[in-house]
Amino acid sequence: MKQVFISQHPLVHHKLTLLRRATTEPKKFRELVSELSQFLLYEATLDLPLQERAIDTPLAPYHGHQIAERIGLVPILRAGLGMVDPILDLIPTAHVWHLGLYRDHATLQPVTYYNKLPPEVDVDLCLVLDPMLATGGSAVAAVSILKEWGASRIKFLGLIAAPEGVRALHEAHPNVPIHLAALDDHLNDRGYIVPGLGDAGDRLFGTG
């Protein structure tokens, strides 16, 4: 799939192994999610347009550049929250809007319970954030909500995905790039990614 980008960075592979480990404590887990999120952001923003900006250094005038687009972050609650702060560290001017979606454990279908989008679109690029792309239901629903809202450019950033989730998101929204740290083997009968890392939300917030 042309729109699927899986990181090949050695540090991503290293940190992802630590993240997956069952004995990794919540504090370390959060740190690793933060670090991996910044690696993914770097790769997902390589095509950001720039505009010229004139500044003064302590020694002389300088003609530099700044990001030309307004960026919005859309974390899918609750696990997506773990990816917000590290991205804001790099793009502090980004707007943040929350979408609450949970997966019904009986049907494995997404249910929307919270939507904090403003009345009108005021960004050029939306980054949907969710550590896990399992069935793809929540990601598909989130992107659909953003498109109905009027967002024109959308990218998905996730740490680990199952082929089923990637396929579902790509088929529903083929124009949305998918940036991942890893693509795993399959989903089990409970809808969990295998080998995966378990429930990202529980591990982030110590509720498992």
Swiss-Prot record:
Obligatory cofactor(s): Mg(2+)
Span of the signal peptide: none
Residues reported to bind 5-phospho-alpha-D-ribose 1-diphosphate: R78, R103, D130, P131, M132, L133, A134, T135, G136, G137, S138, D199
EC number from the UniProt entry: 2.4.2.9
Co-factor remark: Binds 1 Mg(2+) ion per subunit. The magnesium is bound as Mg-PRPP.
Annotated catalysed reactions: UMP + diphosphate = 5-phospho-alpha-D-ribose 1-diphosphate + uracil
InterPro entries xrefs: PRibTrfase_dom, PRTase-like, Upp_B, UPRTase/APRTase, Ura_phspho_trans
Sites where the protein binds uracil: I193, G198, D199, A200
Pfam families reported in the protein's UniProt record: UPRTase (PF14681)
Class in the EC hierarchy, top level: transferase
Domain of life: Bacteria
Keyword Chaperone assigned: no
Family: Belongs to the UPRTase family.
Known function: Catalyzes the conversion of uracil and 5-phospho-alpha-D-ribose 1-diphosphate (PRPP) to UMP and diphosphate.
NCBIfam families: PRK00129.1 (NF001097), upp (TIGR01091)
Protein name per Swiss-Prot or TrEMBL: Uracil phosphoribosyltransferase
Organism of derivation: Roseiflexus castenholzii (strain DSM 13941 / HLO8)
